């Protein structure tokens, strides 16, 4: 299906954050028209562990986008582009068929604290930073 972007009128911004997903609709002059937000559950399976259900994340993104589009009766062909931000260094794994293997490990999780301290003690923190462009966390954060 061919979409003529010159006839399109809207931009969508998706902010998939640590506690909720938000979608914001802008007109072609970048004036905010409306927004939708949906929170999702935080899982704390043990002290220092923070996880999210990937399906809840995905559903919250879909719900917010669908809601703002239906609220203003906008078709996908009316959308010029979509920008997406996400929640820092949260990680999740999929199998080769795209099935989620487990809950997402949230950036606030402290299960790697001991490993990060070992890297610092070995003096290879700068090497880790050169690969990731992230500082090693202190106490897991």
Region locations from a protein language model:
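Carbohydrate-associated surface elements
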Residues: 109
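Active-site metal-coordination/substrate-binding segment of hydrolases
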Residues: 115, 119
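Structured, solvent-exposed acidic/aromatic patches
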Residues: 122
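Short glycine/proline- and acidic residue-enriched helix-loop micro-motifs
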Residues: 125-131
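N-terminal glycine/serine-rich phosphate-binding loop of ATP-dependent small-molecule kinases
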Residues: 2-103, 113-114
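Conserved small/polar residues in nucleotide/adenosyl-binding loops
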Residues: 132-138
